[in-house]
Amino acid sequence: MDQIILQDPELAQAIILESGRQIDKLELIASENIASTAVREAQSTILTNKYAEGYPGKRYYGGCEYVDIAENLAIERAKALFHSEYANVQPHSGSQANMGAYFALIKPRDTILGMNLSHGGHLTHGSPVNFSGRLFNIVSYGVNKETGLIDYEEVAKLAEKHKPQLIVAGASAYPRIIDFSKFRSIADTIGAKLLVDMAHIAGLVATNLHPSPIPYAHITTTTTHKTLRGPRGGMILSTEDMGKVINSQIFPGIQGGPLMHVIAAKAVALGEASKASFVTYQKQVILNAKTLAKQLLDAGFNLVSGGTDNHLLLIDLTNKKITGKDAEKALDQAGITVNKNTVPFETLSPFVTSGIRIGTPALTTRGLCEQDMIKVANWIVTALNNINNETQLKEINKEVTYFARQFPLFSW
């Protein structure tokens, strides 16, 4: 930071303030995590200077012999970690990984059957405001209204009726195990391809705490942050025979030069994820989520699907007569960061919402365990029961700040 402070004090101030926010607040946004010092060091290296259009051994620029080493390390580690024949580590984000995968499997105006955004899907699974909804014909499936679980019978019926060329499984706000074998069976019945977006659960899949989609999906995409705890970026996994077409759809299809400093950081994160300590970490992520779920259920809060099998919970606040927007604001005042989130069969705008999504990856990285999550749950309950009581929220904030400062940002 020394050079930033000297050369750009305005930016330095923003970074310092953000550092303080991350230290002093409890991060419960399910898609966020805390990268290790090694990951961040790799991302800030001199590799950022190097253009490397193409792939290892087949570049359009000279001088790529050392960045080739970095990219090959990331590729081989990804393949080993997920037991995949092929890996592309160049996508700049999960959205670009999905875009490249779509173009590798189908054509514009083809039909995609994907999960409804308000039921837990993702923008890139067919939202009309996203490229996926603009370039492709979209049919959406959802969850059962009574159980909150993916309605596989509905998926099968919609597939039979609309004959999509591609079925997308995976979610951004679904707290239960996904049965990829059922999705593949449905896809095979109608001759469709199956894409699995495992961005949220990649860390759990890597440690065998969630069934792997690799044996079932024609292509699997993921981000490299979230539960995988790496730099922000994307990745594609598939069979060797799909490699050539996927590579061409990423470069030159939708990207130019890869970000070699980020790819180096991906290599570091994938190496970290192969260690025994990462398995212990992921187990704790789930234990913490289940503890949080139990405490909130006991306090009278409604959880979509009644609980969680993974790293996140989706809280429907309708019975509390609180909007997600107001809950997010109150919790932020109390020192707890969450995001407002639509819930299945949502009646409010996505800028207001009826729910909040919370997750445990970041707090688990800081070293919190089940006992600590009971405290966190109590603060959440108290804050949401007093959303208009600024004095109470400020008091919680003081307690949260003192508590949070007992934990380093990265403890693994």
UniProtKB/Swiss-Prot annotation:
This is Serine hydroxymethyltransferase. (6S)-5,6,7,8-tetrahydrofolate binds at L117, G121, H122, L123, S349, P350, F351. Pathway: One-carbon metabolism; tetrahydrofolate interconversion; Amino-acid biosynthesis; glycine biosynthesis; glycine from L-serine: step 1/1. The record marks H225 as: Plays an important role in substrate specificity. PROSITE patterns: SHMT (PS00096). Its main location: cytoplasm. It catalyses: (6R)-5,10-methylene-5,6,7,8-tetrahydrofolate + glycine + H2O = (6S)-5,6,7,8-tetrahydrofolate + L-serine. Keywords: Amino-acid biosynthesis, Cytoplasm, One-carbon metabolism, Pyridoxal phosphate, Transferase. GO terms for molecular function: glycine hydroxymethyltransferase activity; pyridoxal phosphate binding. It comes from Lawsonia intracellularis (strain PHE/MN1-00). Its EC number is 2.1.2.1. The gene is glyA. Belongs to the SHMT family. One of its GO terms (cellular component) is cytosol. One of its GO terms (biological process) is glycine biosynthetic process from serine. Its cofactor is pyridoxal 5'-phosphate.
